[in-house]
């Protein structure tokens, strides 16, 4: 395939780095992607970024902008690299089914084919532990649990399709190796979702109640640990390892009560923690009633309820996952403890701190 017009010329520094240390981060301008770029550079990699728009500047990074579903746009960013990290996705709380399907599934199929066309050897996918979650308790869940037959949302539905496509493309005979990393509850500095949304809800007085008894354990995973898992997967993935065509949970390995975690963020930024309890069953059936009402009036009025049964399940059930497989096969250990991760995150959002 010929070089596309406008393709950046590689610098001498990049040319001095062996192909095994050249990589592309698809979605590299996003929350996880930026952290991944930073750690890869720190470890001596030459890094390309492919994204729909450029979100930051770094003279050591080559940026390629375009449509994930276009091989013509994507190919220049993958040419000459050994490894591709694919972490592009619409935000999980988006409710646009067509967008999720186009980016997470159609776009990923294009990533696979373009990787093969460009001679990429390794494709590391950012998947999600939610691909096995159906709204009921999961305690220390392992990777051999089946995919959810009733995914919690459009995001998860298309992440299942995406992960299946990537793992199914693993072909050691043709020197194309794939694996998928399944984080859960990613948080950290520059997070555009969890902390800002939480603080906005607190400002509106919506964080006074907790669903259930507050004891349900959940995995929240610090972004640096998620990146570490991706890089370990890439560095351990070879034709003679058991990583190929497999998925791996990556967590902080410190399950924490869901409401305790949120409370630590809130109080760290000078907001009150939830004080009152709503029984789980009551919250679930209220959400179910709201969903039914929305369905009934949908021919007349289109509404997007935020209080849904599955979101109640996310807040009120146990869902934490074993990362023993990643420990055994790639030597994974979290780099940052939960206490340090929460502290770093709170300090990074000082601009959201409530003035007392």
UniProtKB/Swiss-Prot annotation:
It catalyses: a 3beta-hydroxysteroid-4alpha-carboxylate + NADP(+) = a 3-oxosteroid + CO2 + NADPH; a 3beta-hydroxysteroid-4alpha-carboxylate + NAD(+) = a 3-oxosteroid + CO2 + NADH; 4alpha-carboxyzymosterol + NADP(+) = zymosterone + CO2 + NADPH; 4alpha-carboxy-4beta-methyl-5alpha-cholest-8-en-3beta-ol + NADP(+) = 4alpha-methyl-5alpha-cholest-8-en-3-one + CO2 + NADPH. One of its GO terms (molecular function) is oxidoreductase activity, acting on the CH-OH group of donors, NAD or NADP as acceptor. Keywords: Acetylation, Cholesterol biosynthesis, Cholesterol metabolism, Endoplasmic reticulum, Lipid biosynthesis, Lipid droplet, Lipid metabolism, Membrane, NAD, Oxidoreductase, Steroid biosynthesis, Steroid metabolism, Sterol biosynthesis, Sterol metabolism, Transmembrane, Transmembrane helix. It is a single-pass membrane protein. The modification N-acetylmethionine is found at residue 1. One of its GO terms (cellular component) is lipid droplet. Homodimer. This is Sterol-4-alpha-carboxylate 3-dehydrogenase, decarboxylating. It comes from Bos taurus.
């Amino acid at each position: 395939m010929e070089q596309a017009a406008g393709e950046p010329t590689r610098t001498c520094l990049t040319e001095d780095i062996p192909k095994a240390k050249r990589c592309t981060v698809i979605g590299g301008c996003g929350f996880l992607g930026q952290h991944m770029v930073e750690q890869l550079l720190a470890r001596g990699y030459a890094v390309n970024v492919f994204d729909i728009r450029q979100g930051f500047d770094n003279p050591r990074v080559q940026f390629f902008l375009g449509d994930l579903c276009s091989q013509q746009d994507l190919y220049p960013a993958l040419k000459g690299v050994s490894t591709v990290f694919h972490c592009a996705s619409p935000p999980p709380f988006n409710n646009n089914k067509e967008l999720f399907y186009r980016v997470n599934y159609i776009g990923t199929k294009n990533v696979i084919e373009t990787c093969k066309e460009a001679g990429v050897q390794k494709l590391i996918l950012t998947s999600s532990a939610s691909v096995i979650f159906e709204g009921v308790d999961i305690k220390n869940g392992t990777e051999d649990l089946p995919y959810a037959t009733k995914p919690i949302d459009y995001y998860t539905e298309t992440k299942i399709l995406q992960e299946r496509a990537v793992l199914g493309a693993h072909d050691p005979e043709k020197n194309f190796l794939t694996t998928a990393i399944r984080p859960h509850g990613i948080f950290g500095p520059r997070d555009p979702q969890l902390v800002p949304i939480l603080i906005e809800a607190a400002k509106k007085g919506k964080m006074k109640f907790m669903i259930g008894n507050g004891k349900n354990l959940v995995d929240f995973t610090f972004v640096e640990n998620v990146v570490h898992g991706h890089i370990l997967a890439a560095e351990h993935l070879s034709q003679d390892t058991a990583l190929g065509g497999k998925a791996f949970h990556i967590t902080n390995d410190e399950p924490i009560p869901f409401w305790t975690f949120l409370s630590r963020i809130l109080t760290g930024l000078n907001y009150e923690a939830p004080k009152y309890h709503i029984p789980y069953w009551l919250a679930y059936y209220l959400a179910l009633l709201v969903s039914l009402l929305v369905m009934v009036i949908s021919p007349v009025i289109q509404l997007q309820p935020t209080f849904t049964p599955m979101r109640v399940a996310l807040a009120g059930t146990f869902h934490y996952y074993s990362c023993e497989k990643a420990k055994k096969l790639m030597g994974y250990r979290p780099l940052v403890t939960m206490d340090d991760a929460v502290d770093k995150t709170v300090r990074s959002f000082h601009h959201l701190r409530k003035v007392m």
